[in-house]
Amino acid sequence: MATEDDDSFRILVATDTHLGYAEKHPERGNDSFQSFEEVLELAVEHNVDFILLGGDLFHENKPSRYCQVRCMDLLRKYTFGDRPVHFNILSDPAVNFPHTKQVNFLDPNLNVAIPVFSIHGNHDDPAGMGLLCALEMLSSAGLINYFGRVSDLNDIKISPVLMEKGNTKLALYGLSSIKDERLHRLFVENKVKMLRPKESLTEWFNLMTVHQNHAKRGPSNYLPESFLDPFLDLVIWGHEHDCIKEPRHSHQNFHVLQPGSSVATSLTPGEAEEKCAFLLQVNSHHQFKVDPLPLKTVRPFLFEEVFLSEYNIEDEVKRIKKTELTKEESTWELLMKAKALGEAKGKGRGRGRGSKASDAASQAQIKDNPVELFVEHRVRELLKGAKKLLTGHPR
């Protein structure tokens, strides 16, 4: 984008926050909430007009009460206040937000400073009686504006949220998560239609957010970019956890931004990429600019593949023993001692000599196993690398 003007939309974009992931873990239980709070802090810091979330706000379809309360408290803390909202909604709220029939910042009973717009993902999709999802609870409480839900899975019509800020017109399309094979079939059968404003088509910046497989994981187990309408300008692609910092130009002539997740939920190379939120700016000249905002509260995560066939393990172990294992006890020895201590406390006098002998044999086996020693050394090196990634953030 060439220049920012007073009419420019400033949007904080994030996807896949997975609130509640590993919430019972003694070490990692707070990770998802810390990163989500940082996303909200960035929205306040960068004085955005609204926050756009691309699905999987929650990790579980039925988030715990603890998780729901943490989420609601954070949203109230950072998105409510006396700051005025500087854009208008031109479309029919009853169509865009069928559950509440209105956008939250126009509710006279609420003081919303930074509106949040969100679609649902595959983790927090509607289910159970009434086919409701956790986002509808947040919507009923006036904390978010839940949009992009499909009411008829045999004939999908996507109606945009039409926004105006000065001379800038923004059409926001949302498509919440649908099973990839089903959505693929509906597109093939021409049963997905994206509605457009009736007037001044060229004046609108067309922004869409989806939550589907981006990478091809089978003949129909993904959403091809070619299925989306070419009149779009930018697509925010949720569901994929790899963070791709630069918008990519597709063959359909629109750009695609894949923000990735804000917390690692699986042991894959993509989760080891630096995690970011994004500041999206759209001006009155139909231009946009995307700035990655690296998240500083994310727990460092390193991923490495080791092919033992590429190493002479015996030589590697000799080198390791000379340089590292002669200086301090190995991690495995410490783990075995901790295990033995825990069992001794648990069983007390009930332990016999046979058990102690078994522990000693296990320690000796681990210490003398060259593969174990080699892998342990690689883990030590990864931990050293992870320490260098710490940002010094107070959380």
Region spans (language model):
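Non-catalytic terminal accessory segments
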Residues: 9, 89-92, 309-395
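Short, hydrophobic/glycine-enriched beta-strand segments
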Residues: 10-16
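Amphipathic alpha-helical interaction motifs in eukaryotic regulatory proteins
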Residues: 15, 37-40, 44, 72, ...
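Binuclear metal-dependent phosphoesterase catalytic core
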Residues: 159-166, 258-334, 338-341
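Acidic/histidine-rich helix-loop elements
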Residues: 19-34
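Active-site metal-binding motif and surrounding structural segment of the metallo-beta-lactamase
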Residues: 39-59
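His/Asp/Glu-rich metal-coordinating catalytic cores
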Residues: 2, 50, 62-266, 271-274, ...
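Short amphipathic alpha-helices and their capping/turn segments at secondary-structure boundaries
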Residues: 1-8, 35-45, 162-163
